[in-house]
Amino acid sequence: PDHAEFLQYIENHDETRYRVECGDDAAAAAGAAIFTLPGVPMIYAGQEIGQRGRRDAIAWDHAREGVRDRYERLIAVREDHPALGPEGNLDRVGYHVASGDLSERPIVASGDVHPDDVVAFRRSDEDEQLVVVLNFAPESASVAVGVDHADRDLVTDESCVVVDGEGTERIRVDDVAVVREAEE
């Protein structure tokens, strides 16, 4: 039906925790993916505090505040930017990736060819266009996207743009960066 949406999740009671299987860095990016891709995000019991056990009682006394804070920011960004919600469009954007040191040779990614750890896409509605970059790698990446964009990450509210040795602006991303696309 028109009013139905897919549920987006990375963990449930039948599977080992994503954080245990893939590590903290990939879990942070996957958590960001469920809030930036189309669909309804589902947070499984304790995922928002870094819970590691599958069917254990939620260990509130051992909550990882950094994980909880990150989920709070992702929820706030999704609420503040309807383009990330169910009515938002999802489109590809071309991008180039350099991990770690900006002097490294970039990996070209466009069309159906993607580096394993990074993906970039556009979410848009009639009011705004956002570029989302997800990095599942354990180290930060520098990503040049094929559209003009602002320099402030909406998740961290900090500048995320760096310039490489050739003068190319790149989005520096640990796990996720969401930036506004520049208006024409």
Where in the sequence are the language-model features?
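Conserved alpha/beta catalytic core and glycan-binding cleft of carbohydrate-active enzymes
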Residues: 1-54
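Short, glycine-/Ser/Thr-/acidic-enriched flexible segments
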Residues: 14, 48-50, 126, 136-139, ...
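Aromatic- and carboxylate-lined catalytic core of secreted/periplasmic carbohydrate-active enzymes
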Residues: 51-112
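Membrane engagement elements in two modes
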Residues: 72-75, 150, 175-177
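Carbohydrate-binding surface patches
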Residues: 94-148
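Beta-strand-rich binding/interaction modules
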Residues: 140-162
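C-terminal beta-strand-rich structural cap/linker in extracellular carbohydrate-active enzymes
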Residues: 162-184
